[in-house]
Design a protein with these regions (language model features):
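N-proximal helix/coil linker or "cap" segments that precede and/or mark the start of modular domains
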Residues: 194-222
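Long, charged, low-complexity terminal extensions
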Residues: 169-186, 197, 203
Length: 222
């Protein structure tokens, strides 16, 4: 079933007609025009169920192998559609992030499923996650990419934090050190501040985080 929002693919010089009944968004949505096929495909991908939570029970090597197999499978299905090269290349990247964002939850699920194991991510898992760039501005409109970004910087930036008191500062520093794109940096810092406010019912204790936010996210045209 579709959520009440869906990413669309648009391209200069191409046309797209959208038909939808607001009272039945999921059941009535369809597309026409030169980009109708691509956007119908994206709708199908949003509905498709391709990830089984039982995968989290696999050991690290088996899990990463399964994630790579899922990516290969979805890419082959995409290539069989014979869409234009520009969309196909972008969609291959989005597919990777759609798997990676689910894979990023593996350590948490693994520890919950096997609490006595004291699991810590090894090089196989860490290398797999780090193979997905966090500086991919072309995909900032894709939810899978944005979700992966947030998960990844939270995982990396909160390492070594003492409890939860200053973990946001560590994440902010990680963003400053690793993110090159001003657009991506602004998105991540905005989400980090928003999450801090929600978790702490305000901005008390967020002096450093807010100083970074104001420095990096101020509109230069104002």
């Amino acid at each position: 079933m579709l959520h009440n929002a869906l990413n669309l693919y648009l391209s200069p010089g191409e046309d797209l007609e959208i038909y939808v009944n607001a009272k039945n968004f999921s059941g009535s949505l369809y597309f026409r025009g030169s980009l109708g096929g691509i956007n119908s495909y994206l709708k199908e991908q949003e509905i498709a169920v391709f990830f089984d939570k039982d995968y989290y029970a696999l050991n690290e090597e088996e899990f990463v192998q399964k994630m790579r197999a899922l990516i290969d499978e979805k890419v082959k299905l995409l290539e069989a559609k014979n869409f234009d090269d520009s969309f196909t290349e972008l969609e291959k990247q989005r597919i990777g992030y759609s798997i990676a964002v689910r894979a990023s939850l593996y350590p948490s699920f693994r520890r919950n499923m096997y609490p006595d194991e004291d699991y810590r991510p090894g090089s196989v898992f860490s290398d797999f996650l780090s193979s997905f760039s966090i500086n991919n501005e072309r995909l900032i409109g894709a939810k899978d990419y944005r979700d992966f970004l947030l998960n990844y910087v939270y995982i990396q930036g909160s390492r070594g934090a003492q409890g939860w008191e200053n973990y946001s500062d560590g994440i902010a520093d990680y963003i400053l050190a690793t993110v090159n794109s001003p657009t991506i940096k602004s998105f991540l810092l905005t989400q980090l501040v928003y999450n801090y406010i929600c978790e702490n019912n305000g901005i008390e204790g967020a002096d450093y985080l807010l100083s970074v936010f104001h420095q990096e996210c101020t509109d230069p045209n104002k």
